[in-house]
């Protein structure tokens, strides 16, 4: 019977025998791709290399998704297998199906040290449904595949906020453990989640305002933050909530992205948690590519907000430097444009000086990489939206499924 590592309520790869075993490994290779099917950013694939290298004496079958139905990047995983081969220095074979007879035969023929990547899991319709683990265990995917394996490893923290069959279904029918990346994410984020030192400061920006407004609500509800520093589109929503006239072009952006309902939610949060949510004092407008800094009550109607201003940068930086815990998610401005990366750069430098620093989100990590700040952060999360969901204390079905398996198998 497996035994949990002390202090953990799930099993890790150290807790089970993996040598020459048949391993089903859920990874997240979902990456930005160009129109020709080339992968533009290899960080997702690189993040799983530690796990793959530790399984060199096993027979490994990987599952991943790419894009969503209807998206331009909703495509096969052939390019991912080729890139994984290059990065790993070992052959990763691509199988253009998931659980057909052909795919199952390919799995059965694997020898020790072989690695196979199955087709995009979202090509299977039921993968796109969020259901309870016991329901997912009855899907064709799980029923066809699970008899071919000895162990299921979930290394895909970044999709573990979803209750999809490739994430939770196999935990009902196979010995199930966390991969190295998964374990690192949970351990690193837990230090932030369970931090009882103050102040705890969150700098939250980017364009996904609806997601972040919910996260702000959840974090404040559980008393997890002393300050929330708003930037990006998130800040625009909160500025509108306190009656600031953000200008026609910025208001239209909020309307077009269906974020107007978030303004009323933001207004309620500002009243309920007075003094905890901080809104910019000044911003930088994009005036034909040039940076035009103005106070928030002087925003011009025809110019888009592209960054926070110098006074806000100074105030926010002070909060972050003095924090016992800092969490940075989402850029403060349009980091891709040189004129509007100042806010993101300065806040990232400040956050790195806090006692325990966490950063996540694709654009944020890219900025940290460009600034050479990787070694300055306590934990860099590859989890994207899942990392901020985890820090808000929200339910994570993929992780809960691993914990439930450990609870069942490790009973006295």
UniProtKB/Swiss-Prot annotation:
UniProt keywords, alphabetically: ATP-binding, Cytoplasm, Glycolysis, Kinase, Nucleotide-binding, Transferase
Secretion signal, residue range per the UniProt entry: none
GO biological process: gluconeogenesis; glycolytic process
Residues annotated for ATP binding in this entry: 336, 361-364
Pathway(s) it belongs to: Carbohydrate degradation; glycolysis; pyruvate from D-glyceraldehyde 3-phosphate: step 2/5
GO MF annotations, alphabetized: ADP binding; ATP binding; phosphoglycerate kinase activity
EC annotation from Swiss-Prot or TrEMBL: 2.7.2.3
Catalysed reactions, semicolon-separated: (2R)-3-phosphoglycerate + ATP = (2R)-3-phospho-glyceroyl phosphate + ADP
Protein name, entry field: Phosphoglycerate kinase 1
Native source species: Methanosarcina acetivorans (strain ATCC 35395 / DSM 2834 / JCM 12185 / C2A)
Lineage of origin: Archaea, Methanobacteriati, Methanobacteriota, Stenosarchaea group, Methanomicrobia
Encoding gene, per UniProt annotation: pgk1
